[in-house]
Amino acid sequence: MNKPKRGVVFAALLAIVLLAGAVCALHWVNAVSLRGTANLTAYTLTDGAAQNLVPVMEDPWVDRGVLHIRGALLRLDQPVGEVKVRVGLIPERIEDGNAQQAATLLNTQMERRYELAQEYGCDDHCGFHASVAEKYLEKGNVQYCVVLVDETDGAKRMITTGMTVTLIEGGLAFVQKNAPEEEAQHAR
């Protein structure tokens, strides 16, 4: 019986490792890429209160050149009801205060949030985690208003979150968001 030569085995293993590395790199590029834009005129801009929707935002962070935004959109109108949202950023130039007419959409993954479901009595399919590479966003004189683009049940709405983000070289320069007491007050 012929034994395979070490060189052939090594080459096959190297090819598998390189292929796995390429697949991982493609997944990473996909995860931090933009997902297009949403025209503001096609959506109703709301804070969610009239629809019994409560945005809960966690502090965003930058890690290895990627901006991460995590939070949840609570549906208080029914105990069971999945939320499917995308995170959007509306750029506003700080010097003139002019906002763009479109929200830049981020890659958004939905996640379960058991602790929020128990606290507010909503479905646990309410969480999200969005990410984008910093290189796709302007830095310095642009402030981004974070919105949640919700098309659940055929509705087309952008829900304001009370959070704004400004990027500088090396991280976040400014983050403003509603205090937890305001979010809890909004939920009642």
Residues covered by each model-derived region:
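N-terminal secretory signal peptides that target proteins for export/translocation
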Residues: 1-3
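Basic, ligand-binding patches in group-transfer machinery
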Residues: 6-188
